[in-house]
C-alpha cells in the first residue's frame, strides 16, 4: 500500500461529496474508518423516512466496549492504528451485526442500551430501539 494513488480523492469522483478540490489536494487516511448510517439520502441531502442516528450506534458500541472517535448525526468515525488486531476488527463487525439484528427485530431498549434505560427508567421503560431511533431522527 505504498502507492499514494489508492488514497487520492479526485474532484470527478462523486462518492466523497467534496466539490472543487484541486488535483492532489486531498487524500483519504487509511487509518480512519467512517461508517455512514441510514437516515439521509447522500445524493439529495434530504432526510429519509427512517434513520439510525450515529449517536445511537456510538452509545451501543460504547456499551460493548468498542471505542468510537466520534458519532455525528448519521455517521460514526473510528481511528484505526497499525497495531489493530484481527480480533479487534472482528469485534467491531460483530457489534454492528448484533445491532442490526436488534434493530430488525425492534428489540426492547433495555436489551440494546441497558445502561441508558437504567439511568432513565421512567423515560425508556418499554421503549424499543426503533422508537428511539425514529424519535431522534
Give, region by region, the residue ranges found by the protein language model.
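Non-catalytic terminal extensions of PLP-dependent enzymes
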Residues: 1-137
Amino acid at each position: 500500500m505504498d502507492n499514494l494513488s489508492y488514497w487520492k480523492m479526485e474532484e470527478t469522483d462523486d462518492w466523497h461529496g467534496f466539490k472543487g478540490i484541486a488535483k492532489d489536494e486531498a487524500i483519504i487516511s487509511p487509518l480512519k474508518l467512517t461508517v455512514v448510517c441510514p437516515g439521509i439520502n447522500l445524493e439529495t441531502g434530504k432526510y429519509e423516512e427512517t434513520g439510525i442516528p450515529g449517536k445511537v450506534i456510538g452509545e451501543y458500541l460504547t456499551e460493548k466496549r468498542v471505542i468510537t472517535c466520534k458519532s455525528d448525526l448519521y455517521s460514526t468515525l473510528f481511528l484505526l492504528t497499525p497495531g489493530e488486531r484481527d480480533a479487534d476488527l472482528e469485534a467491531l463487525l460483530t457489534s454492528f451485526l448484533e445491532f442490526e439484528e436488534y434493530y430488525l427485530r425492534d428489540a426492547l431498549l433495555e436489551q440494546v442500551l441497558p445502561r441508558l434505560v437504567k439511568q432513565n427508567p421512567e423515560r425508556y421503560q418499554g421503549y424499543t430501539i426503533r422508537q428511539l431511533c425514529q424519535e431522534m431522527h
